[in-house]
Design a protein with these regions (language model features):
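Ligand-binding pockets and gating/stacking loops
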Residues: 1-421
Length: 421
């Protein structure tokens, strides 16, 4: 396996591929003109877009420039991500099945639109186990800013029908990362340890009688909570980080920003956390896409590039897989001054852990409406991720209610070998 861990940078709300990674000069030429019917005929359109005969093209709202030795054309709104163009592989031919945020996130995270399935991080913990016993193996953090802050349901990091010890743990971005990390006044760590040993002894007796795996999970969770009272304060104490690191990320300790979360993500990676998921809410740009992209770029551009550069400098990028992207794309048609949800095409990029830096794969049509070449499904993305972790996606299964479930579903998923070194 090339990867030991995954950092998933989820740009929640549906980033526009047309203002980030997918260069469309023909769309710019048709700006303000009617959307050619040849693209939309027979297509189911989002309800928010209005009648079909009023659809107008909206040209890219930001200039694209070549970045890196690979010369990849990328939005000039994200110059810092442009500076790592030679480290990332871009896939411009993604599509999804769900046009609303929550089910689209559910599909991206679990490979199914049916709530209650295990999330990516839970599957990884089930398949590989944790690489640390001092912190949870699956950690989630959220930030917001730049647009409408769509809520992120906790089931996006749930373990579903897998044992609950595999579910993600959400860290707070401000204040104590987890509740009750400090003991109440008058309760020493020794007192807490004695209480924990007594409770676990009783749970062990109950487990021997009932043979319930959730009792074993409860014991493990109590033990993890006790360890986290020591490990979490050390994790979030960034006071020993040098000033140049804060400058690199653009982070201010404790401000709850995406930049601060990226710095914590690096520290989680150093400590062996298997799956780290950062959500940044603010990409739902139904209006003012030009200004909103500028705003959200101010939140995520510098920190995203800093995370890649920092991991690379520390020798961690070679075994850390980074995935950047959202739940769907945006329409090439205007919705006022913005763009509507779009499932036929969107872009993601990957870096680290055996990814071919500077590579590009797939293409959309000349307006960015639909995939035209080398389609990549969400399940293909999952299969590729698992491959880099040394997992055969067809063999990572769990029997539930008489069926063998897997992250990549029952249809054939393809590993995107073209973005692998």
């Amino acid at each position: 396996p090339k990867a030991k861990r995954v950092i998933h940078l989820c740009m929640a709300g549906g980033p526009s591929h047309l203002e980030t990674l997918d260069h469309k000069p023909e769309l710019a030429r048709l700006n303000g003109k009617p959307m050619p019917e040849s693209f939309t005929k027979g297509q189911q359109l989002a309800q928010l877009q209005g009648s079909r005969n009023k659809l107008k093209c909206l040209g890219p709202q930001h200039e694209f420039k070549p970045y890196g030795e690979c010369g990849r054309l990328m939005s000039s709104a994200f110059p810092h991500i442009g500076s790592i163009a030679d480290d990332i592989a871009v896939i411009n031919s993604m599509s999804t099945e769900q046009i609303n945020h929550d089910p689209a996130h559910t599909f991206m995270n679990t490979g199914s639109v049916i709530p209650g399935r295990p999330s990516m991080g839970s599957w990884l913990l089930y398949g590989l186990g944790a690489d640390t016993d001092e912190l949870p193996g699956f950690v989630v953090m959220t930030s917001s800013g730049g647009g409408q802050d769509q809520p992120i349901a906790a089931r996006q990091w749930h373990s579903g029908f897998l044992p609950s010890r595999f579910q993600g743990v959400k860290f707070n971005s401000k204040g104590d990362p987890v509740h009750y990390v400090n003991n109440p006044a008058g309760v020493s760590r020794d007192n807490q340890g004695d209480l924990l040993n007594t409770i676990n002894g009783l749970n062990n007796l109950l487990g021997q009688r009932q043979n319930d795996p959730e009792i074993a999970t409860r014991i493990a969770q109590y033990e993890m909570a006790f360890k986290m009272q020591a490990s979490v304060p050390d994790l979030v104490d960034v006071s020993k980080e040098p000033k140049h690191v804060f400058d690199l990320y653009g982070a201010k300790p404790g401000d709850g920003s995406f930049a601060s979360n990226c710095l914590v993500a690096r520290r989680l990676a150093e400590r062996g956390v298997r799956f780290i998921q950062l959500y940044h809410r603010g990409w739902d740009h139904h209006g003012n896409v030009k200004g909103a992209i500028n705003t959200v770029a101010g939140h995520i551009d510098k920190a995203t590039a800093a995370l890649v550069k920092d991991l690379k400098e520390r020798g961690l990028l070679e075994d850390t897989l980074i995935i950047w992207g959202g739940e769907f794309g945006r329409t090439p048609m205007a919705q006022g001054s913005g763009r509507d949800h779009h499932i036929q095409a969107f872009s993601v990029w990957m870096a680290g852990a055996g990814i071919k830096g500077g590579a590009s794969w797939g293409a959309t049509d000349e307006l960015g409406y639909a995939v035209a070449k080398d389609h990549v499904s969400v399940h293909d993305l999952h299969a590729t991720m698992l491959k880099q972790l040394g997992i055969n996606h067809e063999r990572l299964t769990y029997r539930f209610q008489g069926l063998d479930f897997r992250l990549t579903g029952v249809e054939k998923a393809r590993i995107v070998e073209e973005v692998l070194a």
